[in-house]
């Protein structure tokens, strides 16, 4: 499981990017992959843990959990 910080997240569009701790490419984050109840969103600067998978356009975060 990887860790990182939310770089930005657009709640209206339901996606954003996470900067990985230790470097590497930013990881795409979609609201459907956030482990939370109710309205799922992330805040800029929020620490998270996640799994990285390879999506159609690059690395993608799954099982996103606020740290």
Swiss-Prot record:
Domain of life from the UniProt record: Bacteria
GO CC entries: cytoplasm
Molecular function in Gene Ontology: DNA binding; nucleic acid binding
InterPro entries documented for this protein: Cold_shock_CspA (IPR012156), Cold_shock_domain (IPR050181), CSD (IPR011129), CSD_CS (IPR019844), CSP_DNA-bd (IPR002059), NA-bd_OB-fold (IPR012340)
Annotated keywords: Activator, Cytoplasm, DNA-binding, Stress response, Transcription, Transcription regulation
Official protein name in the record: Cold shock protein ScoF
Keyword Transcription regulation: yes
Disulfide links within the chain: none
Record's note on what induces expression: In response to low temperature.
Subcellular location field: Cytoplasm
Gene: scoF
Record domain CSD: where: 4-64
Pfam families for this protein: CSD (PF00313)
């Amino acid at each position: 499981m990887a860790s990182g910080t939310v770089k930005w997240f657009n709640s209206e569009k339901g996606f954003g990017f996470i900067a990985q701790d230790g470097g590497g490419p930013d990881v795409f984050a979609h609201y459907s992959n956030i482990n939370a109840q109710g309205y799922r969103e992330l805040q800029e600067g929020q620490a998270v843990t996640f799994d990285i998978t390879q999506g159609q356009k690059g690395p993608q975060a799954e099982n996103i959990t606020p740290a």
